[in-house]
Swiss-Prot record:
One of its GO terms (biological process) is lipoprotein biosynthetic process. It comes from the Bacteria. Belongs to the Lgt family. The gene is lgt. This is Phosphatidylglycerol--prolipoprotein diacylglyceryl transferase. PROSITE patterns: LGT.
Length: 270
């Protein structure tokens, strides 16, 4: 697709008759599948049956998407109150990661209780997978030309030594923008490497998951400050408030669980 003289990628991957298949959905699906593969592989190593994470994903992903959409709609209610037919339209994006995370955690707790397994063990195993899915999923925002930052010049983007296809896709309505999707994606990929390395340290159970929350939240806080489409509550950027909250809560949980003797088991223990 061309916009002016700048070639750009089409957000529609293929057309199946009258039905367009968007890159956004394909990329999100790819992130889920790769994350599932990573979790099932590690789960089997730690004695978790392969179908456990398959079953969890089949339940958790739809619920996470529902919560992600609800979260987004709630903070954009002024628009959706006037356009209720758009509430269920997620083809163009509009999924808030923090909402999805809330839905996934609630589902994980209930699932673990029903299966009679430790939620913290499942959460630790899943942590790198979740972050991998988020790292990949940000490229869906890239295809949709959303979740970008403030205006910049082409020279600025070229100075980052980015490939032309990224620079061109950041050209929206005659203006170049910060590729904040890329900053967050790279931060998340680095986090995946960190979490995989920390598996070998044999942390106390639950602390790998809290490390994920802290790592993601720190990166999201700074990237959010560059974005122009932040969900707001008065003068506050909701994602930044949530990020600070998750860091504080994670640190408190780590300290309290250790002091109360609730973190005696290690990651590698069955």
């Amino acid at each position: 697709m061309l916009l002016g003289s700048v070639p750009q990628l089409d957000r529609v991957a293929i057309q199946l008759g009258p039905f367009p298949v968007y890159w956004y959905g394909i990329i999100i699906g790819t992130g889920v599948l790769l994350g599932l593969w990573l979790a099932t592989r590690e789960g089997e190593r730690l004695g978790i049956p392969k179908d456990t994470f398959v079953d969890l994903v089949l339940i958790a992903v739809p619920i996470a998407i529902l919560f992600a959409r609800m979260y987004y709609v709630i903070f954009e209610w002024e628009y959706y109150a006037q356009n209720p037919s758009q509430i269920i339209n997620i083809r163009q994006g509009g999924l808030a990661i923090h909402g999805g995370l809330i839905g996934a955690v609630i589902t994980g707790i209930l699932f673990a209780k029903r299966r009679g397994v430790s939620f913290w063990k499942l959460a630790d195993i899943a942590a790198p997978s979740i972050l991998l899915g988020q790292a990949i999923g940000r490229w869906g925002n890239f295809m949709n030309q959303e979740a970008h930052g403030d205006e910049v010049t082409r020279q600025f983007l070229e100075g980052l030594h980015l490939p032309d296809f990224i620079i061109n896709q950041m050209y929206i309505d005659g203006v170049y923008y910060h590729p904040t999707f890329l900053y967050e994606s790279l931060w998340n990929f680095a986090g995946v490497i960190l979490l995989l390395a920390l598996r070998k340290v044999n942390l106390r159970r639950g602390e790998l998951f809290f490390t994920y929350l802290i790592w993601y939240s720190v990166g999201r806080f700074f990237v959010e400050g560059l974005r122009t489409d932040s969900l707001m509550l008065g003068p506050l950027r909701i994602a930044q408030v949530m990020s600070i909250g998750l860091v504080v809560i994670s640190i408190i949980f780590i300290i309290v669980r250790r002091k109360m003797g609730q973190a005696d088991k290690r990651y590698l223990e069955n």
